[in-house]
UniProtKB/Swiss-Prot annotation:
Keyword match Transport: no
Protein name, entry field: Hemolymph 65 kDa lectin BG06
Protein keywords: Lectin, Secreted
Tissue/organ expression: Hemolymph.
Keyword Secreted included in the entry's annotation: yes
A molecular-function term among this protein's GO annotations: carbohydrate binding
Function, in words: Binds and precipitates antigens of the parasite Echinostoma paraensei.
Induction text: By infection.
Compartments where located: Secreted
Protein's organism: Biomphalaria glabrata (Bloodfluke planorb)
Amino acid sequence: FFTTFDKDNDDQQNDN
């Protein structure tokens, strides 16, 4: 997911 849905972890926005 390249979206910034995980605003809490902006550092890991591209986790997948």
